[in-house]
Amino acid sequence: MTATALEIAQALLRCPSVTPADAGALGVLEALLQDAGFATHRVTFSEPGTADIDNLYARIGDGAPHLCFAGHTDVVPPGEETAWSHGAFAGDVEGGLLYGRGAVDMKGGIACAVAATLDYLAANGGQPQQSGKGSISFLITGDEEDVAVNGTVKLLQWAAERGERFDHCIVGEPSNVEAIGDTIKIGRRGSQSGVLIVDGRQGHVAYPHRASNPIPDIATLITALNDEPLDQGSAQFQPSNLEFTSVDVGNPATNVIPAQARAKFNIRFNDHHTQETLRALVEQRLAAACGNRIRARIEWLPSNADVFVTKPGGFTDLVSAAIADITGRSPDLNTGGGTSDARFIAKYCPVVEFGLVGQTMHQIDERTPVSDLDKLTAIYRGVLERYFR
C-alpha cells in the first residue's frame, strides 16, 4: 500500500524548512520517489549575497506526453510559536484538521501530488502508461518564499540543458478561495516596482522664494499617474493597477524645505503590456505631467515577474473535468493574486496552479481539513488518468 497524502504531509511538516533551510524536507520526497522508480537529482544553486539552495528533480517514464508537478518545500517563519494551538512543525491532527506551517502553502499540495502519483503508478505497472510511453516529473525547490533566485528559475534552466521537455505542468499552490475545486489559476499578472524621484532645492521655510519644494510637485505627479487607468483589462485579466506605497522626504526638521521627495510604487500589469512597454507608458505620462517645470525621474527596480496566461482549452478542460468528477464543481479560471513560480514555468510549457484552499496560509494555526487532502489527491489521480489515457 502506498503512502497517503496525510502521512506524507505530516512527514514534510515535521521538517522545519523555514526558507532558506531545507531541514530534510527534500529528502522525504526523494526517498518516496526513488522507491517508486523515479530517477532523482539533488541540485544546489548559488548566487552571491544569497543562501545556497538545494532543489529536487525527479522523473519516471520516457518521452511525451510529459506532465510535471512543481512546488516548494520552504515555508515562511511561523511567527510567535506560543500563539499556535499546536506546534508549528508538529504535524498534529485534531478535529479532522491538519495543523502546521506549510499545511496549505504548500507541503499539503505536494503531498497530495506525490500520493496520487504513487497510487497511480502502482495501479499501472509502475509506468505512466502501460505502453511505456509518457513521463511524470516533480520539480521541487526550497527557494520560493524568499528571493526566488536559486530555485525554480535555475532548476528549469538546468533541466532544459539536460534535454528535459515538459508538455504541461501543475503547481500545487493553494489556488482555491472557499472550497476545493472552486478555482484554477491559469495565469498571473506581472509585477514591476519603481521609485518616483522629484528634485527640488533645499531652503529655509521663511524664504520659500529661495527654495523649491518637491512635496507639492510629487503630490501633483502621484495624482496624475493615478488618475488615468493604465488599461481596461483583457479577456483573462483585470485592469492593470499602479499603487503608491510610500512617500518620503527624509526630513526630520519643521523649518527646512527638503531637497528631494521620493515615492515608491508597484504596478500589477496584465497581458496588454510587457515590462518594457509598461515602463515606456508610465515614463510618457510622467513627462506629460512634469511639463517644463517639474524635475522628476523614475528608478525602476529589477523584476523577474512577467505576466503569463495559459489559454483555456485542452489542458484546463482536462483539469476541470477531474475536479468536477470529485467535487461536482466547475472551477473558475482565474488570474488574480500575487506572483508565483508558475511565472518561470510558463516560459517552458502551459502551466496551471491548483492546490488546497488558501484561507489560512501564512497565518498562525495554518491548517487544512484532512478531507481536503483526500479530495485533492483524488483530483490529481483523475488528472493522471485522463492525461495518460
Swiss-Prot record:
Zn(2+) 2 binds at residues 105, 145, 362. It catalyses: N-succinyl-(2S,6S)-2,6-diaminopimelate + H2O = (2S,6S)-2,6-diaminopimelate + succinate. One of its GO terms (biological process) is L-arginine biosynthetic process. Zn(2+) 1 binds at residues 72, 105, 173. PANTHER family: ACETYLORNITHINE DEACETYLASE (PTHR43808), N-ACETYL-L-CITRULLINE DEACETYLASE (PTHR43808:SF31). Homodimer. Belongs to the peptidase M20A family. DapE subfamily. This is Succinyl-diaminopimelate desuccinylase. It comes from Rhodopseudomonas palustris (strain HaA2).
